[in-house]
Amino acid sequence: VLAKTLFFAYRLVGLRLGSYLGGRLGLLAGKISPDGQRAADNLAKAMPHLSEAEQEQVKLACFEQVGRVFGEMAHLPKIAREADSRLSIEGAEHVEAALPDGGPAIFIGGHFANWEVVMLGIQRLVGDTGALYREPKNVFMRKWLLNQRDAFMPIKIPAGPEGSRELLKTLKGGTSVALLIDQSLPQGDPITFMG
């Protein structure tokens, strides 16, 4: 209920202010949440060459950016409608050179900046694209988020064994797919990472 209330408020105040307020809440979460402490611990391991102040700056910038993404999620349909004026694509010539016949291709990315908007750019380059996604754990948010994504993610492929088969079927059918591959998954063998 809290998340839906926040998204309603973000939508009410508009895209720019919603993004800003989301960023402010993200900063607060980075300072007081257990996730903020986990991020600080991971940064100390990953970037020991940075001072504690620099590590804190990196951590808070990450939390602010994630907060901004959440603030912008309430406006995904608007962003999709205004993509021509809001989105610029650099390096499109590389995609065109790699896919002279139009595809299909596998686009791989991570959760950087507003990762939701990446699909708009891919679709501008190659048309409708299948997107692998993980359903939110919060059942109340699941339907809302899928509806928000309808504007730019017409082919949604849920993560998991069935999704893997659907992903291959989509590629074999001549349609490109996109994956964000930096998520942790509960399946598989555990490994020690960074000590």
Over which residues does each language-model region extend?
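Membrane-anchoring hydrophobic helices of lipid-metabolizing enzymes
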Residues: V1-G109, R142-L146, A151-M153
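Soluble catalytic domains of membrane acyltransferases
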Residues: P77-G195
